[in-house]
């Protein structure tokens, strides 16, 4: 039986407060090879690039929360075995990793980035630097709350 794979496009720019991230996701969507039979899902993200405000110490917290929530819903609806994610910044990984952690008991995550993404609102204001902390249940309390089964530190390298 063939595994179900989805292509998830999340052009989030608010989590990093950088409109260029939006276009990065769109470029990746176009240049990445497509395989027949893989459903492509795009999470709607505003492209007005208006200045963002802080909420609870987090840049655009409500907008970013809604995007992650919409991503969780889209993934749950499709119930894939694999997820290919193209996004503007690191936060787009939260919903896919959280879903896969629920689906697979032995999930391991190799986190490769220029910074560890283990911040919280007391340390840094942009959500893209909190994604791994959110997955571990130690980041932004609002977005960490969207993770139904947190990663254990032993699952992350």
Residue ranges and their predicted role:
Residues 2-157:
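Conserved alpha-helical scaffold segments that buttress catalytic/binding sites
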